[in-house]
Amino acid sequence: MSYQSHEYYLRRAIEISREARAAGNTPFGALLVNKDGDIVMEQGNIEITDKICTGHAEATLAARASHEFTKDFLWDCTLYTTAEPCAMCAGAIYWANIGRVVYGMTERRLLELTGSNEQNPTFDLPCREVFPGDKRQLRWWDLFRKWKQMQPKFMKAIGTSRRTLYGYVF
């Protein structure tokens, strides 16, 4: 798949994160793309509005997808997300059998932006360290280098600035 295709899906994930933020949640979004390039599922963060501590976009999408699709189908899919999946979400992606993950911002960069805020507690255990134990060889792509160049556009797209991302002052 071309970089332009990855960028297209990441831009849609940004739109989903804007929708999540507008609904009162933190701005995270994820979507699932099948092997033909069709978006088959979208999910924003629901942690705050639904009062579900595991309501991250990626974990919720993985749970929904595993209920709706077969493991074989999901192995050929790609999950796109605005930020690198946390350890919990990486586990959900693994158990759902989603074959690929593409994210725009590393977990460590997210931690730099949010600081140690109780709404974004992190294990500092990126999916890049969780997935290598997977014997099925799930694949992931870090588009962070290019994403860094797009970050001001990302902040503008979700309606905030770097200083007020997630409503926190840095």
In which residue ranges do the predicted regions lie?
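Immediate flanking context of iron-sulfur cluster ligation sites
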Residues: 71-83
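Zinc-dependent deaminase
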Residues: 1-20, 94-170
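Glycine/small-residue-rich phosphate/adenosyl-binding loop
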Residues: 41, 58-67
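Short beta->alpha transition motifs characteristic of CBS
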Residues: 40-47
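Local cysteine-cluster metal-coordination motifs and their immediate loop/turn environment
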Residues: 82-100
